[in-house]
Amino acid sequence: MRARLTFSLWAASLAISSLSIADELARQEQIKAFGAAGFNGTSSACEIEETGNYTPVTMELVKDLNGDGRQDALITEGSASCYGLAGTGFYLVSRQPDGQWKLMASESGSAEFLASKGRDGWPDIQVVGPGSCFPVLRYDGERYRVHHRMGDTCHE
């Protein structure tokens, strides 16, 4: 199993520890990607407010998800006080042609990339959390929006 890249919010110097993902994304690009997701080297509101378990901001995946030749990254953070019963949230960021990073999607829950695709080759994302009827997000050329729901108890 691939090691995870953990972003230490306590360190003002944007300390990043990694075993394998660091090889996939240069340090400066990691910092830009975290910044696009809203994590800029200070403690997040989730980290400050959390009284129970807190999972630090982590870069879970670095991969070209839409086939444009540029890397994309999935960033997660765990906190029941910020993300409710799901206990986790995700941020999908993408490197743009100008070298900047853009937030493509963020939700409470876990992201599961599906084989189906929206515009520009972006994979649909099933947002998994508590329950058994989950939204599926599809990229429409501007942003990810709820496209449909999947699960045992969905009545569509």
What are these language model-derived features?
Residues 19-63, 156:
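Terminal domain-start segments
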Residues 66-78, 92, 119-129:
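Acidic/hydrophobic-patterned starts of short beta strands in beta-sheet-rich repeat architectures
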Residues 58, 88-90, 132:
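Repetitive beta-architecture junctions, highlighting loop-to-beta-strand starts
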Residues 4-6, 20-36, 114-156:
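Acidic, small-residue rich beta-repeat scaffolds with periodic aromatic anchors
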Residues 56-67, 109-124:
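Beta-propeller blade termini
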Residues 8-17:
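Bacterial N-terminal signal peptides
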Residues 79-82, 132:
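Short glycine/acidic-enriched loop and turn motifs that connect beta-strands
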Residues 22-32, 41-43, 85-105, 136-145:
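Beta-propeller blade repeat segments, especially FG-GAP/WD-type strand-to-loop junctions
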